[in-house]
C-alpha cells in the first residue's frame, strides 16, 4: 500500500500520476525490410532515369543548353607545369581552395544554374521541426557519385543541395529523393567502373 511521502502506487496506469498505459515501445523496429533483388531493381530503374533529360528537368533541375546528354561523367584531368603535362585522377585532385575549384568545374559543365537554384531555394521550415534542429529545407541539387569519399568528395560536400555518395553505397533514395526519379547526377570515371 501507499504510505505518505512514497509514490509506490503511482506505477499503475490507472492511478493518478501513474505511467502511461500503452506507451511507445523502444523495441519497435521502424526500418522496413526490402528484398535484395527489389532493392537492386529500384536502384537500377532510378539510375536509368538519370539519363533522360526530360525527367531530370521535370524534377526541377536547371541545366544549361550546352549540355547535350546526361549523365555527366568526369574523367582524369591534366595539369601542365613548365611545359610538362601530368595526368591525375579527378577524385584525388589538389585541395588548395578545393570547394571553389569544384564550383568552377560545375559551372564549366553547365550545372551552375542548378547550384544557384539550391542556394536560393533554402527556406526556413514551418512547424515544430525548427525547434528540433531541422531549421532549413534545402532543395536537392547535383548528386556526385565517386569511388571513394576523399579529395573531390570532401571539396563538394559543403555545397548546398549537393550530395556526395560512394559508388558502393549508391541507393534508390539518393537517386530519387522523395520517390521522384530523375536526379541530376555526375559520375566520376572510376565510380562508373566500380558500378559495373
Report residues per predicted region:
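Extended polybasic, low-complexity segments that bind anionic RNA or targeting/receptor surfaces
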Residues: 13-196
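Active-site cofactor/substrate anionic-group-binding motifs, chiefly glycine-
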Residues: 1-9
Amino acid at each position: 500500500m501507499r504510505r505518505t511521502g512514497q509514490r509506490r502506487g503511482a506505477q499503475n496506469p490507472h492511478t493518478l500520476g501513474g505511467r502511461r498505459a500503452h506507451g511507445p515501445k523502444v523495441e519497435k523496429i521502424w526500418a522496413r525490410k526490402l528484398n535484395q533483388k527489389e532493392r537492386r531493381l529500384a536502384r537500377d530503374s532510378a539510375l536509368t532515369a538519370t539519363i533522360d533529360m526530360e525527367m531530370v528537368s521535370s524534377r526541377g533541375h536547371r541545366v544549361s543548353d550546352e549540355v547535350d546528354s546526361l549523365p555527366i561523367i568526369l574523367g582524369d584531368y591534366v595539369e601542365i607545369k613548365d611545359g610538362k603535362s601530368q595526368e591525375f585522377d579527378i577524385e584525388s585532385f589538389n585541395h588548395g581552395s578545393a570547394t571553389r575549384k569544384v564550383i568552377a568545374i560545375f559551372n564549366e559543365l553547365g550545372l551552375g544554374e542548378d547550384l544557384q537554384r539550391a542556394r536560393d531555394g533554402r527556406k526556413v521550415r514551418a512547424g515544430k521541426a525548427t525547434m528540433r534542429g531541422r531549421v532549413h529545407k534545402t532543395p536537392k541539387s547535383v548528386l556526385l557519385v565517386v569511388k571513394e569519399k576523399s579529395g573531390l568528395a570532401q571539396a563538394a560536400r559543403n555545397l548546398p543541395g549537393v550530395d556526395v555518395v560512394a559508388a558502393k553505397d549508391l541507393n534508390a533514395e539518393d537517386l530519387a529523393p522523395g520517390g521522384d526519379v530523375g536526379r541530376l547526377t555526375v559520375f566520376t570515371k572510376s565510380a562508373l567502373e566500380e558500378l559495373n
